[in-house]
Amino acid sequence: MTLDVSKVQTPMRIDRYLTQQVENMTRNKVQAAIEEGRVLVNGKPVKSNYRVKSCDHIHLTFLRPPAPELAPEDIPITILYEDDDLMVIDKEAGMVVHPAFGNWTGTLANAILHHLGKDADELDKTEMRPGIVHRLDKDTSGLIIIAKNPTALHKLARQFANRQVEKVYKAIVWGVPKAESGTIKTNIGRSHKNRKVMANFPYEGAEGKHAITDYQVVEDLGYFSLMDVTLHTGRTHQIRVHLQHLGHSILGDETYGGATPRTLPFSKSEPFTRNLLELMSRQALHAQTLRFRQPTTGEPLSFSAPLPEDMELVLEKIRTVMTASQS
């Protein structure tokens, strides 16, 4: 892993800096890596008390245990559609899509292998992503396409790359945008302050990758909004980062500013928002609609998944309290 230290970074011990910047990294792990010569700054080994400076170039070599073999697991999944080439699954919040460091079991990939049985032998399991065409964040619910053979995987991946797949999400956000609809265009890349999260950069700049998101307010809830959000690109955390950039973070999004209780201009609003966040213990984001073409026949396919129970409950609470506060 390489990290380029921000121009505005204040001096900080390298063990502390890497603990902040690298996911699942502890100070003990950093110090062990430094002692073993696996941390280089500007091409040279350093000690734990080295103070990181602006524009330093850090290279960190990980020593990770070999990944276990991907195994089928009997995990219930909701399949909305299945044919010889693909499945469309309504993923529940809290499920990781594929195994990775820290999450080797209990993933959607494990469930897919169990469901397909011997048919899964056609799929490449070496990268722990059998049939997975695209991803959803762990705590985002909703629709995901799974290819059942290499040809379908290739053709579906090409549809995504050519932006021929329509993806529409439902999001509950804090506040009501001034414009009922709009397009957000920025570059998205790793944050300079914390490499574990993504950040917005100028669209015409050199940093990050182009990201384009459309939004449409479908219900004005007074101090909240229910939105349709359409992705034109597929960057990591794109919707969450873009809605924070708009000034309307997704309710419950701990990483991007949506999980702190707020005081609103009506009586007992803070206990109310605190209760909402207890009910919505994740980002209120649901991949509701997918439109694409069947990879063999070219037939247009369209799918929609109902809002999950937690989002429906939160919407009901908001509507009830907003109606009472305005009466």
UniProtKB/Swiss-Prot annotation:
Residues 12-84 form the S4 RNA-binding domain. PROSITE patterns: PSI_RLU, S4. GO terms for biological process: enzyme-directed rRNA pseudouridine synthesis. Its EC number is 5.4.99.-. Keywords: Isomerase, RNA-binding. The keyword RNA-binding applies. This is Uncharacterized RNA pseudouridine synthase Cpar_0723. It comes from Chlorobaculum parvum (strain DSM 263 / NCIMB 8327). The lineage of its organism: Bacteria, Pseudomonadati, Chlorobiota, Chlorobiia, Chlorobiales.
